[in-house]
Amino acid sequence: AGNKRPIWIMGAMVNAIKDIXDFVNLGANNIEK
């Protein structure tokens, strides 16, 4: 059950990837830290 929780998080991240692309352009490389 605990392992299923992070799964939905990854799904949200996939959708956020499009926004992340814009964030990277803004210089949000620090997000990796």
Swiss-Prot record:
Presence of the UniProt keyword Nucleotide-binding in the record: no
Binding positions for Mg(2+) per the UniProt entry: E32
An example Gene Ontology CC term for this record: extracellular region
PTM per Swiss-Prot/TrEMBL: Contains 2 disulfide bonds.
Cofactor requirements of the protein: Mg(2+)
Location of this chain's protein in the cell: Secreted
EC number(s) from the headed UniProt entry: 4.6.1.-
Claim: Aminoacyl-tRNA synthetase is one of the keywords in the record: no
InterPro entries given in the database record: PLC-like_Pdiesterase_TIM-brl
Tissue: Expressed by the venom gland.
Cofactor note: Binds 1 Mg(2+) ion per subunit.
A biological process term (GO) from this entry: lipid catabolic process
Catalytic reaction list: an N-(acyl)-sphingosylphosphocholine = an N-(acyl)-sphingosyl-1,3-cyclic phosphate + choline; an N-(acyl)-sphingosylphosphoethanolamine = an N-(acyl)-sphingosyl-1,3-cyclic phosphate + ethanolamine; a 1-acyl-sn-glycero-3-phosphocholine = a 1-acyl-sn-glycero-2,3-cyclic phosphate + choline; a 1-acyl-sn-glycero-3-phosphoethanolamine = a 1-acyl-sn-glycero-2,3-cyclic phosphate + ethanolamine
Domain of life the protein comes from: Eukaryota
Protein purpose: Dermonecrotic toxins cleave the phosphodiester linkage between the phosphate and headgroup of certain phospholipids (sphingolipid and lysolipid substrates), forming an alcohol (often choline) and a cyclic phosphate. This toxin acts on sphingomyelin (SM). It may also act on ceramide phosphoethanolamine (CPE), lysophosphatidylcholine (LPC) and lysophosphatidylethanolamine (LPE), but not on lysophosphatidylserine (LPS), and lysophosphatidylglycerol (LPG). It acts by transphosphatidylation, releasing exclusively cyclic phosphate products as second products.
Family: Belongs to the arthropod phospholipase D family. Class II subfamily.
Stated name of the protein: Dermonecrotic toxin LiSicTox-alphaI-1
